A protein has these predicted regions:
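C-terminal functional module detector
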Residues: 38-40, 124-130, 135-137, 149-352
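Glycine/proline-rich, flexible active-site/cofactor-binding loop segments
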Residues: 101-151
Length: 352
């Protein structure tokens, strides 16, 4: 697929409102970088479709790992992790702009109008190696590669203030409707929902910097999370986690907000609207589970039993775990069985 076909699929077939192109930097030539910038400028239509220029900084995990770089404007410099697969000597003239470690990347991006997100692909991001709170505003929790709650735990343990995003990364040119099929990728691609007052770059970048967004594993559920305080709270304007200034005093905060609160307790409100019935809602404070809410009782289940096999054994490219197994019951019978969350059609129940 061409880059134009890629963008048009996301806009016209997957019905995305916001998207970007995140090619591996070591494969992006100078001419292709200019082509991508022309495309995003052409396709970006405030109020209709937000198309963001950017690239994937694709370094090995040992020097920081993959990062998604999103520029607010076209014409910015691409700071590659390397020129590894760029063969044309004329494309080596900007080699001094390369950033070979995540720390160097943040240095070169300092002062630029951009947002960085920690990406979990083949070379997963190590946010304990390097992190800049003024630039890196979010971590990726789900994509075609799977689900990575561990990177959220890493961030919380380090005291980072981060948002959570989900992406496609299916390598098949189907952003927003990315299914793995018979392939190495084991999951449906993720989506990010932005809480923004308008559909334009300014509003979306403000949402990214204030972490006003959430991720899903590909469904389009609606999630409204807020906190009400009894006393006035000092809401802080933020720039990638860095407190910049206080705004007017408020008594309601939404996801991603930072505020100085004097109350000993606050009221948490969570509204979830799913495309299917909700199984449960886990509420964490940092990395600690403090409440598990189920919208049903045992009698509602009838004779159904749910068996879940999940998880990964490794953080890197070979993270996919083969969950082959069997189930046998004594003194009873299995009337019917069906799979859930299984996207590879060549796998599943062989016999029953």
């Amino acid at each position: 697929n061409t880059a134009r076909e890629y963008f048009c699929f996301g806009r016209d077939r997957a019905f995305l409102d916001v998207m970007g192109h995140q090619g591996n930097d070591f494969q992006i030539t100078g001419s292709f970088w200019k082509d991508l910038n022309r495309l995003t400028a052409e396709l970006d239509k405030p109020g209709e479709f937000v198309c963001i220029p950017g690239y994937e900084w694709s370094a090995n995990t040992a020097v920081g790992g993959d990062r998604n770089v999103h520029y607010r404007h076209e014409g910015e410099t691409i700071h590659r992790s390397s020129h590894a697969q760029i063969a044309d000597p004329t494309d080596m003239v900007d080699e001094e702009e390369d950033a070979h470690t995540a720390g160097l990347l943040f240095e070169k991006l300092k002062g630029k109008d951009c947002v960085v997100m920690a990406h979990v692909g083949g070379r997963y991001a190590d946010i304990t190696y390097a992190h800049d709170e003024t630039l890196e505003t979010a971590v990726e929790v789900h994509s075609d590669w799977g689900t990575f709650e561990w990177i959220v735990r890493d961030a919380l343990e380090k005291g980072y203030r981060i948002g959570i995003v989900g992406n496609s990364d299916g390598h098949k040119g189907r952003p927003g409707a990315s299914y793995p099929g018979a392939s190495f990728f084991g999951s449906q691609g993720g989506l990010t929902c932005f809480l923004a007052p308008r559909l334009d770059r300014d509003a979306i970048f403000e949402a990214m910097r204030r972490r006003h967004h959430y991720a899903t594993t590909g469904n389009r559920m609606l999630l409204d999370v807020s906190i009400a305080t009894e006393s006035d709270a000092a809401l802080l304007l933020t720039n990638g986690g860095q407190a910049a200034a206080e705004t007017s005093m408020v008594r309601k905060l939404i996801m991603g907000d930072m505020a100085r609160v004097t109350d000993e307790r606050v009221d948490l409100s969570v509204q979830v609207f799913g495309s299917v019935p909700i199984q449960m809602l886990d509420i964490f404070r940092g990395g600690v589970l403090i409440e598990k809410v189920r919208p049903f009782v045992a009698k509602d289940l009838g004779q159904r039993i749910r068996v879940t096999m999940e998880g990964a054994e490794y953080r890197g490219r070979a993270r996919t775990t083969v969950w082959d197994g069997s189930l046998k019951v004594n003194g009873n019978s299995i009337r019917r069985a069906e799979m859930f969350n299984n996207w590879n059609l060549d796998r599943g129940i062989r016999s029953q």
